[in-house]
Amino acid sequence: MEPVEQQPYSEYTIQIEAEGFEPKEIAGSQVLADTLSRQPTTLNVMESGETFQRIVIPPHTLFYEYPPKIEEAEIKPINENGEIVLSKVVIPEYIVVHDGPVNDSAAGNYYVRYKDYIKNVASSEIYATWPDDTIRANILAIMSFTLNRVYTEWYRNKGYDFTITSSTAYDHKWIYGRNIFASIDRIV
């Protein structure tokens, strides 16, 4: 699918301040017409001096060209030395998201609730204005791919300490700090 010429959402910058807490700014929060969303965030307690946290939300995957998916073999070799495959399908409470390409050692790892990960990816890869059945079908595809990464311990078997990446070259687009659309939240 080619990116559209006109951006179908507005971007807002949200500034959050509360006494005793570090101020935070979230730039690029995406707002679709007639669509509710929530901007999850937390504030850190101010310790010494004033610090400022800024989160920048990049463009939506349907509006911007991210790296294309790197092809993987449809049938993966099994029983490699030291390989771990879970004995049963498990829906985890948390997954570890590596916020960058696989080999980027400077990218952070985030412990994210599985359900919140699915909501974030869906909000990053599909539009919340789509029909409910279309949203549901896409969410099921996202869940299937993600659970495959969990079940096969895909990255851990390669020596990494995370479950999945945020890079579209390998996995889904997960965006740290992004807003979640109500229609997607409800379906997940």
Task: Label every PLM stretch briefly.
Residues 2-188:
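Conserved, single-site charged/polar hotspot
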